[in-house]
């Protein structure tokens, strides 16, 4: 059994549905300390289980190189989404079948973290400083995870030169895509207050629905942009409409809706929120925005070339630089240093029978080792 495969099995076998704490971090620590890493673990969040403030465990590990050497960071998350029903094997009992390893987190992203650990075993300490930024809160609210790790790093004066996040970016085969950026995301809750009444006496009531319809119509037709060189066009989607009204003959007292905007770097979360608030207020409504991330772009250059060269050397293919897809914790790490995402094939992430090709684990480990070596010698 390869070392990367063994590490992946150990991590998968430690259940860690978001927010993650405990055993899976014990495994991670047990893997890193024999490789010379100093491991610091801490918990943030003091709320009840199931709430956004539920406790989250985080891990920062560092192996110092010579004084003045470069610092390269690996980042990722050990929490996983709930497994759901219908698996053909137990989701937290890793199982080899044919060429695949099955288990929740196999590709998102315990498999990639296993490859990172295996990779650093093949990078000599004298090459430079390597760290791990690992959270148990990426699949959930992401309030007490990577943000808290960044706060810790800043308090300790720790600043990597480059960071690679192990999200499953590959599409059809390992190495065909890396993420050099991501669009931003803002969710906005809309509300219009009315006056409840009988439908036969509309003059004694105030129907909030026509105003909500006008708000949503204007938002749905709002021109955003046509995209940029690296980003697809921004899009606004109506994701929820709700009227707490179960009777057919009652004019409701309130109408609620929610929209979600994924936006490129021609906007900011604040600028879009301002537009939506103005439209809502024009029609007598209110808007409450929650910005979950700003767009970021690590423009193609030295870092992306390092990754491309490593992928080419191990797979003979050229990875496509892309900014498609959802948000990740790279949106927080961008404030620390240049960051790029690269990892396993994503076809089975968040699905039942999540699985990774075992050969890909060894290949990804070698790619990560090449990237780390190149980053530390740059």
Swiss-Prot record:
Gene from which this protein is expressed: dapE
GO biological process: diaminopimelate biosynthetic process; L-arginine biosynthetic process; lysine biosynthetic process via diaminopimelate
Gene Ontology terms for molecular function: acetylornithine deacetylase activity; cobalt ion binding; succinyl-diaminopimelate desuccinylase activity; zinc ion binding
Catalytic machinery residues: 79, 138
Enzyme class, first EC level, given as a word: hydrolase
Gene3D superfamilies: Zn peptidases
A Pfam family recorded for this sequence: Peptidase_M20
Protein keywords: Amino-acid biosynthesis, Cobalt, Diaminopimelate biosynthesis, Hydrolase, Lysine biosynthesis, Metal-binding, Zinc
Listed pathway(s): Amino-acid biosynthesis; L-lysine biosynthesis via DAP pathway; LL-2,6-diaminopimelate from (S)-tetrahydrodipicolinate (succinylase route): step 3/3
EC assignment: 3.5.1.18
Family that this chain belongs to: Belongs to the peptidase M20A family. DapE subfamily.
Identification of the protein by name: Succinyl-diaminopimelate desuccinylase
Entry's cofactor comment: Binds 2 Zn(2+) or Co(2+) ions per subunit.
InterPro entries for this protein: ArgE/DapE_CS (IPR001261), Bact_exopeptidase_dim_dom (IPR036264), DapE_proteobac (IPR005941), Peptidase_M20 (IPR002933), Peptidase_M20_dimer (IPR011650), Peptidase_M20A (IPR050072)
SUPFAM superfamilies in the record: Bacterial exopeptidase dimerisation domain, Zn-dependent exopeptidases
Binding site for Zn(2+) 2: 108, 139, 350
Functional summary from the UniProt entry: Catalyzes the hydrolysis of N-succinyl-L,L-diaminopimelic acid (SDAP), forming succinate and LL-2,6-diaminopimelate (DAP), an intermediate involved in the bacterial biosynthesis of lysine and meso-diaminopimelic acid, an essential component of bacterial cell walls.
Binding site for Zn(2+) 1: 77, 108, 167
Organism: Erythrobacter litoralis (strain HTCC2594)
Binding partners and assembly: Homodimer.
């Amino acid at each position: 059994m390869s070392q990367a495969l063994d590490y992946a099995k150990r991590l998968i076998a430690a259940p860690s549905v978001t927010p993650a704490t405990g055993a899976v971090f014990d495994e991670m620590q047990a893997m890193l300390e024999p490789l010379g890493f100093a491991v610091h673990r801490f918990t943030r969040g003091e709320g009840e289980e199931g709430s956004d403030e539920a406790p989250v465990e985080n891990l920062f590990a560092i192996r110092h190189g010579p004084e003045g050497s470069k610092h390269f960071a690996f980042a990722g998350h050990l929490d996983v989404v709930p497994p759901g029903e219908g698996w053909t094997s137990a989701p937290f009992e890793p199982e080899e079948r044919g060429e695949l390893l099955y288990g929740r987190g196999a590709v998102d992203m315990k498999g990639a973290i296993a490859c990172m650990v295996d990779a650093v075993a093949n990078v000599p300490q004298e090459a430079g400083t390597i760290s791990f930024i690992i959270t148990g809160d990426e699949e959930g609210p992401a309030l007490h995870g990577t943000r808290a790790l960044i706060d810790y790093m800043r308090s300790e004066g720790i600043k990597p030169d480059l960071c690679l996040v192990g999200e499953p970016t590959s599409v059809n085969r390992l190495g065909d895509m890396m993420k050099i950026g991501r669009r931003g995301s803002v969710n906005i809750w809309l509300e219009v207050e009315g006056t409840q009444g009988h439908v036969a006496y509309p003059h004694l009531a105030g129907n909030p629905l026509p105003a909500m319809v006008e708000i949503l119509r204007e938002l749905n037709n709002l021109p955003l942009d046509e995209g940029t060189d690296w980003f697809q066009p921004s899009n606004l989607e109506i994701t929820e409409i709700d009227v707490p009204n179960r009777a057919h003959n009652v004019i409701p007292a309130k109408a609620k809706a929610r929209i979600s905007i994924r936006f490129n770097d021609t906007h900011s979360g604040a600028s879009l929120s301002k537009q939506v608030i103005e439209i809502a207020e024009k029609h007598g409504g209110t808007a409450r925005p929650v910005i979950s991330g700003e767009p970021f772009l690590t423009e193609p250059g030295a870092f992306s070339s390092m990754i491309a060269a490593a992928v080419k050397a191990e797979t003979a293919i050229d990875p496509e630089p892309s900014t498609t897809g959802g948000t990740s914790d790279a949106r927080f790490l961008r404030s620390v240093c240049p960051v790029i995402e690269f990892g396993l094939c994503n076809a089975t992430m968040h699905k039942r029978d999540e699985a990774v090709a075992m050969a890909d684990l060894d290949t990804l480990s070698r790619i990560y080792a090449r990237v780390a070596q190149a980053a530390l010698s740059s």
